[in-house]
């Protein structure tokens, strides 16, 4: 079994940004993504996913290091001043690297 190194970029953000972020990450080279609901507590207080305007979602992208870096840089520049957003990148090993 051959494993290949990739990056897992996770972005927790306001649900209102979903469409714009999906367009951005695809334009920046992401081949796909996974979106799930998210709730929790952070510097902007408690976020509860039950009320749509106040909901957060988590967007995950498996990609190469250059793509992860490009996405993080672009999203930080475009959104971090006006929206709640947390991004982090971790190392992962994947099967079928051509998918990512």
Place the predicted regions along the sequence by residue.
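Positively charged, small/polar-rich N-terminal and surface patches that mediate targeting and assembly
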Residues: 1-100
């Amino acid at each position: 079994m051959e494993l290949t190194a990739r990056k897992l970029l996770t972005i927790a953000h306001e649900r209102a940004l979903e469409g714009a972020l999906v367009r951005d990450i695809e334009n920046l080279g992401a081949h796909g993504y996974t979106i799930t609901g998210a709730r929790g507590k952070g510097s902007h207080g408690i976020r509860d996913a039950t009320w749509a305007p106040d909901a957060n979602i988590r967007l995950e992208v498996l990609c190469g290091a250059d793509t992860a870096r490009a996405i993080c840089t672009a999203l930080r520049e475009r959104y971090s001043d006006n929206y709640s957003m947390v991004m982090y990148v971790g190392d992962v090993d994947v099967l079928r690297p051509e998918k990512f």
